[in-house]
Curated annotation (Swiss-Prot):
It comes from Chaetomium globosum (strain ATCC 6205 / CBS 148.51 / DSM 1962 / NBRC 6347 / NRRL 1970). The keyword Phosphoprotein does not apply. PANTHER family: OXIDOREDUCTASE HTATIP2 (PTHR14097:SF7). It is a peripheral membrane protein. Disulfide bonds: none annotated. Signal peptide: none annotated. This is Protein FMP52, mitochondrial. Keywords: Membrane, Mitochondrion, Mitochondrion outer membrane, Transit peptide. Coiled coil: none annotated. The gene is FMP52.
Length: 233
């Protein structure tokens, strides 16, 4: 895991992935491409600030040496984007474009932060799940040496701009965890830090040639196991 690239590094999961990678002394370089500077800093960080997302594919291609692993936690909300059509351009189209650019550049592993709903029966009907499913299918079709799909349920984390109704949902999920045990909470949602760590842990396992499959999907139980139970600082 000599060199890594984090897309969506200013978001709730992407920023967690970035912080985790920057704290890892075994990683020589951590690149980011974003519209604004990430909050985390460190001697191994190489941040590219580019407001024009149509240039991100070219920026990715220009990173030398080519990152061994690319993480994408890239995404927005319908409210922030100004509607489903604009959200689709980021959550689906930009992710697809960057996955294609990563494959063309020779990236070995691609890690995508998806959603639990992308694997459900309604994934073809719910707009958000449909976006994520489309990206997953593209990544699978690109045939990376290693693809890792992370499917968290409710993301238990504070956001700069809260999703509509998210604070209430997060509060209710944590309350159920207090009342009925952490096991129930783990099924309903995962802490943002745990999700980020699970993504990094899975990539490390893959780099060691120990991934269970070439196209590895992490569901809620896998996220908790890799990001908390088996995690070692």
């Amino acid at each position: 895991m000599a060199s890594n690239l984090v897309l969506g590094s200013t978001g709730v999961i992407g920023s967690g992935i970035l912080a985790t990678l920057l704290a890892d002394s075994s990683i020589s370089a951590v690149h980011t491409i974003s519209r604004r500077a990430p909050k985390s800093t460190g001697p191994t960080l190489h941040a590219t600030i580019e407001a024009d997302t149509t240039q991100w594919g070219a920026k990715l291609a220009g990173i030398k040496p080519t990152p061994s692993t690319v993480y994408s936690g890239l995404g927005t909300t319908r409210q922030q984007a100004g509607g489903i059509a604009n959200q689709w351009k980021i959550d689906h189209d930009l992710n697809v474009e960057l996955a294609q650019a990563a494959k063309k550049a020779g990236v070995h592993s691609f890690v995508f932060i998806s959603s639990a709903g992308s694997g459900g029966l309604l994934a073809n009907y719910l707009p958000y799940s449909k976006m994520k499913k489309g990206v997953e299918e593209t990544i699978k079709g690109l045939d990376f040496e290693q693809a890792i799909i992370v499917r968290p349920a409710i993301i238990l984390a504070e956001r700069e701009v809260p999703h509509q109704g998210a604070p209430l949902l997060i509060g209710a999920t944590r309350a159920l965890g207090r009342w009925f045990g952490l096991g129930l909470q783990d099924k309903l949602g995962q802490e943002g830090e745990v999700i980020a760590r699970a993504a990094v842990h899975a990539a490390k396992i893959a780099a060691e040639g120990k991934a269970p499959s070439k196209y590895w999907v992490l569901e809620s139980s896998d996220i908790v196991r890799l990001g908390r139970t088996e995690w070692k600082d």
